[in-house]
C-alpha cells in the first residue's frame, strides 16, 4: 500500500516505488537500521531547537519524494548525523514499537541540498520550489502518508484526555473525538499507558484520576518549567556554558540557580549528552557508522567532486574569508547571541549563529548565483529532520543501506573514502580559537559546534579579564603556504596540523633535527642560570607550549584558570622565598581552580623549570645531576626520533630556536624525563598504606600475623627456614662475610623488597640444649613480672616498656629489677616506642644506679614468639648495648650483647597464667641469610624488691589506662569459662608473686652482688598477707571497664537510696568516690588508719621462707607445690571457690610477702617516676656490711624509711631446668 506525496514538481516513479520488495533496509528490518538509531542516548543537540525555527520543516511527520512507500513509525533516537536512507522522525516522539500503518497522519518533506549542483538527484527534494512549498505549509497536518507519528502530549491534550477518559472510560473512538489533535492509534497507545499508571498507583475509581494527573505534573520540575522533551534554546545553552565554566561540572544546584528555566535533572541530562559528544572527539569514528560532518562554516569536503578551486569555496552565508597563510587569534569581542541573516538568492533565508558551542543549525539551503556551482551548507533541522546531502550528492549513505550506497557509487564513480574533517576547538569562556600550531585532535564531527569566527592578527583581550591580559599572536605559517594546493584539505581551519603531513618539516615531531642540533636543545634542559620574572598581564608563547593543556579548548582547563594558578603560585613563591616551595604546599593553597591537582603540579613544574619559582631555593631537591640525566635521555630520544622521522636537515639550528613546536618538545621532554627519572631513582613504588588503629600500615599486612576467629584452632602465620626460603627464591642471596652478617641491621624496607615477605611473620625460637650454653644467666624480680603482666592484661593493643637492672661482666649474669612502662603507638599486631618515653625511662633507671638491660612488649592474643620486626628491633638494641666480656675458658675478650627481650602473651587458650618468653638474637643466620636466629633463654625468678614502688606502678597503670580507648573490659566474662578477665589477671599475678623469708639467710648467699644487698631480721609474715595483697589489686581494678565513666554502676546504686537519711547518703557517696583508703601496719598487733587517698598499703613482717623458681617459658612454673591446701583458691574471691580451673598452677600459686613501709609514704602524692629518690640511696648499698649503719642514719630523714630497695635475703640461685 503506497500513498503519493504532495510535492512541488512531478517526479518519475523510482524502481523502489514499483517493487515494494526492494524497499529501503530500514523498511524491511527495523533492527538493521543505522547504528545511530540504536544509540541508547535518548536526546541529542538536534532536539535543542523548536520545530518552528527550522524553515525547511512544515509538520511533524515526513515524506520522501524518491520513495513513496510507507515507513514504519519508528522513533529516531540521537540521530546526530542522519544519512540519506534513514527516516527522520520527530525527536520529541517517545519510544514505541512499530505500529500498523494508518491512513491519517501528518508529514513533512526532507530537503537535502546537494553539494554537487551539476547532478539533479530525483531521490530527494533538492529543488528550491520544494523549500517554498514547505515554508507555505505552516505546519498544517496532512493525510497523505499512512504512517503514525509519535509526538509528546501537551498539557492541554493531557487535560482533554483525562476529561474524556473519565466520561468514556476505554472508548478510544469517543476519546479521540474529544482530543481531536491526536489519532485513534495515538489515543489508544496513550490510554494503555494511562491505565498502567492507574494500576501502578492503586487508583481504581475514576473520580481519583485527577490525583494521578496532579502527581504527574508535580513530579516534573514545575508547571512553569518546560518538560524534558522541550529542546533547549540558544539562551539556555549559553547560560549552561557560562555556569559550567563558573561552577564546574557536577554542581547542578548552583547551575540551576543561573538557568532558572530548567531544573537540576534537566541540566544534568543536558550536560551528559553534551559531554558525551565532546568525549567523542578523542576516539575514532564508530565502525558501524559513516559519520557525515556538517559544515556550518562552509567547510568543503575534501572528497567533493566539484571541479573548482578552493578559493571559490568561501562561506556565502557568513562571508568569512579564511586566510590560509596565517594562524593567529581572532578578536573575541563578538556577542555569542547575535545572529545574521542573508538572502541566498532563492528566496530562502539561511540563519547562522555565533554562539559558542550552541546547538543551533543553519537551516534552509544556499546556492550560488550564476553558472558556477558552489557547495551549499548541509543543514540539520532543529526538529531532528534537517536536510543532508543525499546519497547521490556526497556519496554518503547509512552503514546498513547497501542498495542506496551502491546507487550513490554508480552516480559518483570517482568518490573516495570519506575522512571526517577535524574542526577547530572553541574556548567557550573567551571565544578563542587556538591555532593549528598547538591544537589537539578535535571531534570527528563539527555538528556540535557553531560557526568558527575568522582569525585575526590582533592580540586577544578579554572583557572578563580584570588585568586586561593579552595573548600574543602566533606565527606558524611555515607549512601553510601549500594549503591552497592541498587536494586533501581545503580549509586551514579544519586541518589541525593535518596540512603539515606533506611538508618536509613536520611540526608534530618532538625532535626536528638530527644530532647536529643537540647543543642548542641541551641549553634548554640545563637548570636556569638566573631568576625570571613573568609579566602577569600577558601569556607568553613559552607558557602556551609548556602548559598547552590549558589552551586546547577543554572546558575544565581554560586560559583564565591557568592565569589564576600561575599568579597564585608566583605570589606564594614571593612570600615563601628563599625557602623551597613544594607542589604539595602550592596545591593546598589553591582551592578554587579545579580539582585536578596533577595539572596544578604540572604548572608548578613548568614554572620551576624556567626559573620563575624556586630559583636557588633552600632545600631545592633538584640538582645538576638530574639535568645531566635529562640531557643524556633527551639526546638518546633525539637520535631515535630523528632516525624514525628521517629528518636529515643539518642546517636548521637557527630555525629550531625560533620554532614553537621545538620549544614545546624541549619543555615537555625535559619535564617528562625528569618526572620519570625521579620516580625511578628517588621515589620507589610503595605499597598502599591505610590508617588502622592509630597507625599507618600496609593494607596487605593487616590480618596476616594472626587470624583470631574465635575457634579452637587459631591460624598463626609462622615463618620457618623453608617458608622464607620459598619466598626468596626469586631473589639471589649474596654471600657476605661473618663480620658483615653480624653487624647487619634489618630495616623495614628490607622486608618490603621481597614480594611476599611479611615483617610481621612470626619466627619460632630455638632452645639451648644445655643451660650452660646460654650467653648469660638471668634473674627477674617478682615486681618486674607483675608490672609486665598487668600492663599487658589491661590493653587490647600491644604494649611496650623497658627493663632496668644490672649486668655483671665477670659472671655474665643479668639481674632485672624493674619494669618501666613506656608510651607507644600501638595496634593489635605492632607497637612502636615513643622516643621521648624511652629517653625518660633510661634517665630514671640511671638516676637510681641501674642500667637498661632489656625491653618487653606484648602479643595480646597470639604466641609470644618474635616476628621479623621484633628480630630487627632486638638486633638493633643488642648491637647498641654490645660490650666486651672475658671468656672463662681462655681468658680472651669477646663481644657480648647483654640486652634481652621479654614477650608477654596474656590471653591464650591454654590456661589462666600468662605466657612469658625471654629471647636473645644470636649471630647465627638463617638458611636464606635474611635474619639472625632467635633463641629462648631460661630465667630464674626472685622476690619483689620494693613493694611500695610496685603499688605505685600499679596505681599509675590504672590511672593511665582507665580512659584508654583500647582498654580491656576486666568485668567481661571470658568465653572459655565462667570467670571474668579480672579473675584471670589476678590468677596470673598470683603465680608471679614471690615474697622473702630469712629462715635460711644466714647460711645462704646470693651469687648476684646487686641483689645481695640487704640482711633481713624482720618478723615472719603471716600466710594471709598474700591474700590481702591480691584483694587490694582486685578492688582497685573491679570497675575497670571500657565505659567512659567507671563509676556509673556505683552512682546508679546511690540513686536507689535517696530515701535514706543524710548520714547514710554521705557514707554511700564516700564509698562511690573511692576516697576510703587503709594503711595497715602490723607487728604484734594491727592498727588501721584512713586517709583521703585512694591507695591502700599493708606491711607485715617477712615470712620465714623464700623461693626461687625457673621457668621454661610455657604455661606455668616448674617446682614443687609446697603451699598448704587451705590456701587453695584463696587468691581468688570466695564466691568462685566451686569453679574448677584447668591451670595446674592455679591451686599452687606462690605468694610473696609484702615488706614493711611507713604510712608516711602513702600520705604523699604519687609520682610516675622515681626521680625523687636520691642518687646516694643505691650507692650506699655497695655492700651488705654497711647497710645497717646506712639504714640507721637515714631512717629518721628519709620518708621512704626503707629506701627504694626492701631487704629480702635471696636464696642460692637455683639450677636451670
From Swiss-Prot:
Binding site for Zn(2+): 857, 859, 870
Domain MPN: 778-921
DNA-binding region listed in the record: 172-195, 252-275
GO MF term set: DNA binding; metal ion binding; metallopeptidase activity
Any Pfam family the entry gives: SWIRM
Location within or outside the cell: Nucleus
Domain HTH myb-type: 145-199, 225-279
Biased composition (Gly residues): 383-394
Protein known as: Myb-like protein H
Gene: mybH
Amino acid at each position: 500500500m503506497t500513498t503519493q506525496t504532495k510535492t512541488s514538481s512531478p517526479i518519475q516513479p523510482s524502481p523502489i516505488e514499483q517493487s515494494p520488495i526492494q524497499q529501503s533496509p530500514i523498511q524491511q528490518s527495523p533492527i538493521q537500521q543505522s547504528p545511530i538509531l540504536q544509540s541508547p542516548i535518548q536526546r541529542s543537540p538536534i532536539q535543542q531547537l523548536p520545530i518552528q525555527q527550522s524553515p525547511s520543516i512544515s509538520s511533524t511527520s515526513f515524506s520522501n519524494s524518491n520513495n513513496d512507500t510507507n515507513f514504519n513509525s519508528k522513533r529516531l533516537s540521537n540521530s546526530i548525523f542522519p544519512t540519506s536512507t534513514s527516516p527522520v522522525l520527530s525527536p520529541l516522539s517517545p519510544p514505541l514499537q512499530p505500529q500498523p500503518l494508518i491512513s491519517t497522519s501528518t508529514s513533512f518533506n526532507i530537503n537535502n541540498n546537494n553539494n554537487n549542483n551539476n547532478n539533479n538527484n530525483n531521490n530527494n527534494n533538492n529543488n528550491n520550489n520544494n523549500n517554498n512549498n514547505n515554508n507555505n505549509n505552516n505546519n498544517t497536518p496532512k493525510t497523505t502518508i499512512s504512517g503514525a507519528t509519535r509526538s509528546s502530549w501537551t498539557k492541554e491534550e493531557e487535560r482533554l484526555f483525562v476529561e474524556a477518559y473519565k466520561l468514556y472510560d476505554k472508548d478510544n473512538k469517543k476519546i479521540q473525538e474529544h482530543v481531536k489533535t491526536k489519532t485513534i492509534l495515538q489515543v489508544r497507545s496513550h490510554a494503555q499507558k494511562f491505565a498502567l499508571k492507574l494500576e501502578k498507583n492503586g487508583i481504581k475509581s475514576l473520580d481519583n484520576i485527577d490525583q494521578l494527573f496532579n502527581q504527574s505534573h508535580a513530579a516534573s520540575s514545575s508547571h512553569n518549567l518546560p518538560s524534558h522533551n522541550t529542546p533547549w534554546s540558544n539562551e539556555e545553552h549559553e547560560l549552561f556554558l557560562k555556569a559550567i565554566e563558573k561552577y564546574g561540572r557536577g554542581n547542578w544546584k548552583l547551575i540551576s540557580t543561573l538557568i532558572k528555566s530548567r531544573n537540576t535533572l534537566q541540566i544534568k541530562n543536558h550536560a551528559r549528552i553534551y559531554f558525551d559528544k565532546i568525549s567523542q572527539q578523542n576516539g575514532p569514528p564508530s565502525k558501524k557508522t559513516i559519520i557525515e560532518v556538517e559544515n556550518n562554516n562552509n567547510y568543503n569536503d575534501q572528497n567533493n567532486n566539484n571541479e573548482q578551486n578552493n578559493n571559490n569555496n568561501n562561506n556565502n552565508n557568513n562571508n568569512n574569508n579564511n586566510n590560509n597563510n596565517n594562524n593567529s587569534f581572532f578578536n573575541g569581542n563578538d556577542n555569542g547571541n547575535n545572529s545574521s541573516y542573508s538572502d541566498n538568492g532563492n528566496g530562502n533565508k539561511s540563519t547562522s549563529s555565533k554562539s559558542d558551542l550552541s546547538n543551533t543549525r543553519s537551516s534552509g539551503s544556499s546556492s550560488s548565483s550564476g553558472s558556477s556551482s558552489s557547495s551549499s551548507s548541509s543543514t540539520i533541522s532543529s526538529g531532528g529532520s534537517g536536510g543532508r546531502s543525499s546519497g547521490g550528492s556526497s556519496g554518503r549513505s547509512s552503514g546498513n543501506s547497501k542498495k542506496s550506497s551502491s546507487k550513490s557509487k554508480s552516480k559518483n564513480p570517482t568518490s573516495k573514502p570519506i575522512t571526517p574533517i577535524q574542526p577547530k576547538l572553541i574556548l567557550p569562556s573567551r571565544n578563542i580559537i587556538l591555532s593549528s600550531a598547538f591544537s589537539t585532535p578535535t571531534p570527528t564531527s563539527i555538528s556540535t559546534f557553531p560557526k568558527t569566527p575568522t582569525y585575526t592578527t590582533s592580540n586577544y583581550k578579554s572583557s572578563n579579564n580584570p588585568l586586561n591580559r593579552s595573548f600574543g599572536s602566533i606565527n606558524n605559517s611555515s607549512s601553510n603556504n601549500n594549503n591552497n594546493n592541498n587536494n586533501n584539505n581545503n580549509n586551514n581551519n579544519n586541518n589541525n596540523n593535518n596540512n603539515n603531513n606533506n611538508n618536509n618539516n613536520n611540526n608534530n615531531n618532538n625532535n626536528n633535527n638530527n644530532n647536529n642540533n643537540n647543543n642548542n636543545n641541551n641549553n634548554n634542559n640545563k637548570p636556569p642560570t638566573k631568576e625570571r620574572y613573568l609579566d602577569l598581564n600577558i601569556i607568553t608563547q613559552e607558557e602556551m607550549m609548556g602548559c598547552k593543556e590549558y589552551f586546547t579548548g577543554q572546558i575544565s582547563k581554560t586560559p583564565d584558570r591557568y592565569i589564576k594558578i600561575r599568579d597564585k603560585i608566583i605570589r606564594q613563591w614571593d612570600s615563601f622565598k628563599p625557602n623551597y616551595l613544594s607542589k604539595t604546599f602550592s596545591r593546598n593553597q589553591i582551592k578554587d581552580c579545579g580539582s585536578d591537582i596533577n595539572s596544578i603540579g604540572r604548572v608548578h613544574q613548568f614554572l620551576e623549570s624556567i626559573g620563575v619559582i624556586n630559583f636557588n631555593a633552600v632545600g631545592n631537591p633538584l640538582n645538576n645531576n638530574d639535568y645531566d640525566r635529562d640531557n643524556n635521555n633527551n639526546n638518546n630520544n633525539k637520535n631515535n626520533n630523528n632516525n624514525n622521522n628521517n629528518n636529515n636537515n643539518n642546517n636548521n639550528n637557527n630555525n629550531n630556536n625560533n620554532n614553537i613546536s621545538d620549544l614545546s618538545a624541549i619543555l615537555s621532554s625535559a619535564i617528562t624525563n625528569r618526572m620519570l627519572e625521579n620516580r625511578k631513582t628517588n621515589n620507589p613504588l610503595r605499597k598502599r598504606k591505610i590508617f588502622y588503629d592509630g597507625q599507618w600500615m600496609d593494607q596487605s599486612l593487616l590480618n596476616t600475623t594472626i587470624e583470631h576467629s574465635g575457634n579452637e584452632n587459631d591460624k598463626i602465620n609462622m615463618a620457618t627456614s623453608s617458608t622464607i626460603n620459598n619466598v626468596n627464591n626469586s631473589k639471589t642471596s649474596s654471600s657476605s662475610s661473618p663480620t658483615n652478617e653480624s653487624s647487619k641491621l634489618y630495616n623495614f624496607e628490607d622486608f618490603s623488597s621481597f614480594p611476599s615477605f611479611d615483617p610481621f611473620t612470626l619466627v619460632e625460637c630455638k632452645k639451648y640444649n644445655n643451660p650452660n650454653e646460654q650467653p648469660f644467666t638471668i634473674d627477674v624480680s617478682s615486681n618486674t613480672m607483675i608490672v609486665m603482666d598487668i600492663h599487658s592484661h589491661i590493653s587490647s593493643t600491644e604494649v611496650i616498656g623497658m627493663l632496668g637492672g644490672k649486668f655483671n661482666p665477670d659472671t655474665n649474669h643479668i639481674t632485672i629489677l624493674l619494669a618501666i612502662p613506656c608510651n607507644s603507638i600501638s595496634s593489635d599486631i605492632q607497637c612502636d616506642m615513643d622516643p621521648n618515653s624511652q629517653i625518660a625511662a633510661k634517665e630514671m633507671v640511671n638516676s637510681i644506679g641501674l642500667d637498661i638491660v632489656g625491653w618487653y612488649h606484648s602479643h595480646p592474643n597470639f604466641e609470644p614468639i618474635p616476628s621479623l620486626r621484633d628480630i630487627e628491633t632486638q638486633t638493633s638494641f643488642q648491637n647498641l648495648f654490645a660490650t666486651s666480656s672475658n671468656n672463662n675458658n681462655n681468658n680472651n675478650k669477646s663481644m657480648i650483647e647483654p640486652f634481652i627481650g621479654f614477650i608477654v602473651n596474656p590471653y591464650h587458650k591454654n590456661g589462666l597464667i600468662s605466657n612469658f618468653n625471654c629471647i636473645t638474637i644470636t649471630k647465627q643466620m638463617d638458611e636464606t641469610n635474611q635474619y639472625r636466629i632467635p633463641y629462648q633463654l631460661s630465667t630464674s625468678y626472685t622476690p619483689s624488691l620494693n613493694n611500695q614502688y610496685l603499688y605505685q606502678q600499679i596505681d599509675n597503670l590504672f590511672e593511665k589506662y582507665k580512659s584508654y580507648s583500647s582498654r580491656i573490659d576486666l568485668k567481661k566474662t571470658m568465653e572459655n569459662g565462667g570467670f571474668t578477665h579480672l579473675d584471670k589477671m589476678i590468677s596470673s599475678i598470683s603465680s608471679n608473686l614471690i615474697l622473702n623469708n630469712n629462715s635460711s639467710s644466714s647460711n645462704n648467699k646470693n651469687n648476684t652482688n646487686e641483689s645481695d644487698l640487704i640482711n633481713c631480721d624482720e618478723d615472719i609474715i603471716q600466710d594471709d598477707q598474700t591474700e590481702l595483697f591480691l584483694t587490694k589489686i582486685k578492688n582497685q581494678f573491679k570497675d575497670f571497664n571500657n565505659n567512659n565513666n567507671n563509676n556509673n554502676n556505683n552512682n546508679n546504686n546511690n540513686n536507689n537510696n535517696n530515701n535514706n537519711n543524710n548520714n547514710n547518703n554521705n557514707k554511700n557517696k564516700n564509698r562511690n568516690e573511692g576516697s576510703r583508703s587503709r594503711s595497715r601496719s602490723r607487728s604484734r598487733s594491727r592498727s588501721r588508719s584512713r586517709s583521703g587517698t585512694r591507695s591502700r598499703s599493708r606491711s607485715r613482717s617477712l615470712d620465714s621462707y623464700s623461693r626461687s623458681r625457673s621457668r621454661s617459658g610455657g604455661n606455668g612454673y616448674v617446682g614443687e607445690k609446697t603451699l598448704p591446701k587451705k590456701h587453695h583458691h584463696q587468691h581468688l574471691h570466695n564466691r568462685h571457690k566451686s569453679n574448677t580451673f584447668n591451670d595446674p598452677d592455679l591451686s599452687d600459686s606462690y605468694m610473696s610477702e609484702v615488706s614493711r613501709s611507713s604510712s608516711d609514704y602513702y600520705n604523699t602524692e604519687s609520682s610516675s617516676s622515681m626521680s625523687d629518690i636520691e642518687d646516694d640511696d643505691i650507692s650506699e648499698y655497695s655492700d651488705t656490711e654497711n647497710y645497717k649503719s646506712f639504714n640507721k642514719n637515714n631512717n629518721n630523714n628519709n620518708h621512704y624509711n626503707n629506701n627504694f630497695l626492701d631487704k629480702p635475703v635471696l636464696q642460692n640461685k637455683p639450677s636451670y631446668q
